[in-house]
Amino acid sequence: MATPTNLVTNRGRRFKWAIEFGSGGSRGRGERGGLQDSMYPVGYSDKQVPDTSVQESDHILVEKRCWDIALGPLKQIPMNLFIMYMAGNTISIFPIMMVCMMAWRPIQALLATPATFKLLESSGQRFLQGLVYLIGNLLGLALGVYKCQSMGLLPTHASDWLAFIEPPERMEYTGGGFLL
């Protein structure tokens, strides 16, 4: 007849998930016998395995982050166009504040360009990313200047600069459908 230890040994071999807690003491892994090795899962190793996929995925994430920084100003242009449309061409405090902020953000970004280029140093395409960043900010600044010109805030006539020159006379007046 089978002894209880043989049953436990056979059970341990047959069911690898069964663990015998009754025998053994506080011995280390190197001192354990063949029976105690069944306590560790299949494929367990004491050695550390180097993972090269982590380094590769980190490089991909750095490139992606650098492109996000470079494309940031270009992503703001549709919102700036919407703000330009909503502000209208009238001169009041809110449209002027919106236009000033629209022009100030690219100026701030252009002044902080060296700090931004430091973030792009780890990228392999830093020249192209820096160029895209610069073009995006210049386009944002051009939108702000265009909006200032369409609101009449930029001096475009000689009478804007000199007090003794009369402003140009309008050739035509419209009144919105009312007879004047």
UniProtKB/Swiss-Prot annotation:
Top-level taxon in the UniProt lineage: Eukaryota
Short name of one Pfam family: EMC4
InterPro entries: TMEM85/Emc4
Ranges in the topological domain labelled Lumenal: 85-95, 146-180
Residues exposed to the Cytoplasmic side: 1-63, 118-124
One Gene Ontology CC term in the entry: membrane
Compartmental location: Endoplasmic reticulum membrane
Membrane topology: Multi-pass membrane protein
Annotated transmembrane regions: 64-84, 96-117, 125-145
Keywords: Endoplasmic reticulum, Membrane, Transmembrane, Transmembrane helix
Gene Ontology biological-process entries: protein insertion into ER membrane by stop-transfer membrane-anchor sequence; tail-anchored membrane protein insertion into ER membrane
Primary role: Part of the endoplasmic reticulum membrane protein complex (EMC) that enables the energy-independent insertion into endoplasmic reticulum membranes of newly synthesized membrane proteins. Preferentially accommodates proteins with transmembrane domains that are weakly hydrophobic or contain destabilizing features such as charged and aromatic residues. Involved in the cotranslational insertion of multi-pass membrane proteins in which stop-transfer membrane-anchor sequences become ER membrane spanning helices.
Assembly: Component of the ER membrane protein complex (EMC).
Entry similarity comment: Belongs to the EMC4 family.
Protein name per the record: ER membrane protein complex subunit 4
Species annotation: Xenopus laevis (African clawed frog)
